Amino acid sequence: MSAIVAHGITVTLDGTRVLDGVDLTVAEGEWLALLGPNGAGKTTLVRALSGTVKHGGTVTFGGAPSSDGARADGGPRGAGGPRERARRVAVVPQTPVIPPGITAFEYVLLGRTAHQGMRLSASLDDRRRSLAVLQRLDLERFAQRDLATLSGGERQRVVLARALVADAPLLVLDEPTAALDLGHQFEILELLAELQQERGLTVVTTLHDLGIAGQFGDRLAVLSEGRLVAHGAPAEVLTPEAIGRWWGVDATCTVDDEGRVDVTVRRRRVAGVEPAANPAATPATTSADDATPVSGR
């Protein structure tokens, strides 16, 4: 069964057509990675799917009927108002808004009450569920810490916890690892993969790193200039020819037994220019006696 069926999604912002008739289907329990160069429309498509930007076309969730067009508030017709969408779709924006002075627990609790209104309406069950998610993500020790004092990786786990506590079947993430180093990127994505399996979640995420997309996405979709130009399994989408066409780089793609794709991007040589010598490959010839002294400690 399809978790999302989007048909003819069109978005115009400030007179510019950002998305142009995008058709996209995401199966239940699938991880779809949205790819494309900067300005391709990835974030706008995520906003259209999650109902936070006005759009033309239709979006259907889990077989629920949807009408043409979009409401004035940006939400897809047939998906209900903001509270109903909060039950269906949990969103992790690229730059989450973090209220000053809020604790990690209070922030996660907002994920339970988004469809209810004010944070003060949280029930005892909401609080228990919020604490349980913090425990699952190994964040319990940070529950009463000011969210702004946590490291980037810890903060991103809390942001993910807020989305998970909503118990929505669809999780939409816009560049969830953009501000993290490589180690923390894989930590967050491995955790997300575990949670997807545990909960049977449908995951839609935008990514810039082709190698990461090839390792984690069940299916990939590529946008270019507001149009969907490819959609399929990683091995079908991530080929040297396709990467050269859409990103303008040379790449080698290796497919493993599970259909995951490892992407290696190669530096392009400029005709007539010799590459600079690699210092690491040149034997050292300077002795300690020849070294230039440095003032200081």
Where are these regions (language model features)?
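The feature captures the beta-strand-to-loop junction immediately N-terminal to the Walker
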Residues: 35-37
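Conserved ABC ATPase signature
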Residues: 121, 146-150, 154
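ABC ATPase nucleotide-binding domains
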Residues: 246-297
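Conserved structural motif at the start of ABC-family nucleotide-binding domains
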Residues: 4-6, 19-21
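Conserved ABC ATPase "signature" region
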Residues: 109, 124-142
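Catalytic Walker B motif of ABC-type/P-loop ATPase nucleotide-binding domains
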Residues: 171-175
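Helix-to-loop junction immediately C-terminal to a conserved catalytic motif
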Residues: 50
